[in-house]
Amino acid sequence: MGAAVTLNRIKIETGIADIRDKYMVLDFNYPEYNRAVRFAEESYMYYYETSPGEIKPKFCLIDGMSIDHCSSFIVPEFAKQYVLIHGEPCSSFKFRPGSLIYYQNEVTPEYIKDLKYATDYIASGQRCHFIKKDYLLGDSDSVAKCCSKTNTKHCPKIFNNNYKTEHCDDFMTGFCRNDPGNPNCLEWLRVKRKPAMSTYSDICSKHMDARYCSEFIRIIRPDYFTFGDTALYVFCNDHKGNRNCWCANYPKSNSGDKYLGPRVCWLHECTDESRDRKWLYYNQDVQRTRCKYVGCTINVNSLALKNSQAELTSNCTRTTSAVGDVHPGEPVVNDKIKLPTWLGASITLVVISVIFYFISIYSRPKIKTNDINVRRR
């Protein structure tokens, strides 16, 4: 039978990135039980926020400790703007009270709780947590008055900032479901917060024919077009007989086989300029701007009928102006006449010069000379 697990050594090491962070290295007689428990001991005086609107010192307030320990880490001038609230649960070494044990890897609240004799050395508490006074609001009625802008006289900034933060999202979600055409709801939607877009996507999936859904589609395209496409798909799937849906959800028929190209370019429900873009999927909206079609007007001056035949002649080719939406692509660049580059001209000049040089050499008359006899002794 093996020997019992015993603790051989405890070593405290200081962190590198933050001097407040430390490691308690526990060495056992069996290496597989070795642990490095990370914890913090607060030493800073806070004059800044750890996250927007709140300060969370690295201090675990255990039972029997005064709450003054928490406030001792904030400079007095800064502390006047904040209040202490009930913080998250934490664990602290009793022999180093106030230390904050980090929960990570194998070290979890359950792991500490299951340790034998853990309560003799580790205590539970709440982490110090301060929140800005401006972030507090009394009751739901006050939230309603601030978020609906009924009375903003005494509203904190976070509830009176034109919906730039998420603090009014919960209220506006319910409020706008009951009154989606309210100007404040449309203002909330124009900020393009995802809760707002999701809310209107759900509303327009039941009431796409309402005017506020036109504004909804205008706002979300092109960045968040999926919210609108989802609403249109659900609405048209539930209202297949609605003629407005015939471009997005055309009734099954063979008539479409007679035409070339996507139906968004020839179907009246798609091509009519009076059509609201909300009845088109985003890709159809883009496609319609690229459609090119030619129309003409037929005037019948005379019509000849012979037995069961009618003969009509019309010249439609005279009207060549294209009608429809302007193509959003890049403008066409006319091809320019390509002129020879300086490099090409230089090479050509050198070649011509060499040719003329050799021609001039070989065209000269031969120089007459006298033969000289040389005899070597």
From Swiss-Prot:
Belongs to the orthopoxvirus OPG143 family. Most cysteines are linked by disulfide bonds. They are created by the viral disulfide bond formation pathway, a poxvirus-specific redox pathway that operates on the cytoplasmic side of the MV membranes. Residues 363-377 are intravirion. GO terms for biological process: DNA-templated transcription termination; membrane fusion involved in viral entry into host cell; symbiont entry into host cell. GO terms for cellular component: membrane; viral envelope; virion membrane. This is Virion membrane protein OPG143. The chain crosses the membrane at residues 342-362. A lipid is attached at residue 2 (N-myristoyl glycine). Keywords: ATP-binding, Disulfide bond, DNA-binding, Fusion of virus membrane with host membrane, Helicase, Hydrolase, Late protein, Lipoprotein, Membrane, Myristate, Nucleotide-binding, Phosphoprotein, Signal-anchor, Transcription, Transcription regulation, Transcription termination, Transmembrane, Transmembrane helix, Viral envelope protein, Viral penetration into host cytoplasm, Virion, Virus entry into host cell. InterPro entries: Pox_virus_G9/A16 (IPR004251). It is found in: Virion membrane. The keyword Lipoprotein applies. It comes from Monkeypox virus. The keyword Membrane applies. Envelope protein part of the entry-fusion complex responsible for the virus membrane fusion with host cell membrane during virus entry. Also plays a role in cell-cell fusion (syncytium formation). One of its GO terms (molecular function) is DNA binding. Pfam families: Pox_G9-A16. Residues 2-341 are virion surface. It is a single-pass type II membrane protein. Part of a stable entry-fusion complex (EFC) which is at least composed of proteins OPG143, OPG147, OPG155, OPG086, OPG094, OPG107, OPG104, and OPG099. Formation of the viral membrane is necessary for the assembly of the complex. Interacts with OPG094. Interacts with OPG153.
